[in-house]
Amino acid sequence: MNIKDVYILDDRAILYLNGENIKNFLQNLISNDINKVNDSNSCFASLLSPQGKFLYEFIIIKHKSGYLIDCEKSQVDGLFKQLSVYKLRSKIEILNLSNEFVVVAFGLEKFLTFDQAKDIPGFTLKYREDPIFLDPRNKKLGARLIINLEKLYLSLKKLELQNADIKEYYLFSHKLGIVPKDLNKLQNKLF
């Protein structure tokens, strides 16, 4: 990855969850420890069926009083529905922000140019008020910025990033053993 390259991940979607007991709600559902997620750390997690079969995978990021979930766009409706089923009477709000926010990825080298950036998978900081995090699955995959669509192009210009071919990003991802697309085929099949 070139230090100036940015990849607009238009196949990703964003959910926002917040509410009184959001931490306990997520702790009882996801495959990772929600206590690891804070303003300076994000994590990779899955949602499993009651039988322990894989349903959804995502990255979870602390944001304001709740959590952002960065997931595959083809899975967002199903994940939203599944989380809503588990919500029951909890005072939890689940919002699909996919039409307002976008996920962009750029290299580790560029991430390390930010003040206070650390070379640790999942390390999270803010660019203005938007979260930037080093991919928790493999830091070599670089960082992701979740940003409001209206601010995207101005922010990319200020960060001196230029749009690059998304195929390069996914080719690199595959070389690292991370398959970020078409996980619907695996639902309810893997333990």
Regions found by a protein language model. Name each.
Residues M1-F191:
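Basic, glycine/lysine-rich polyanion-binding surfaces/domains
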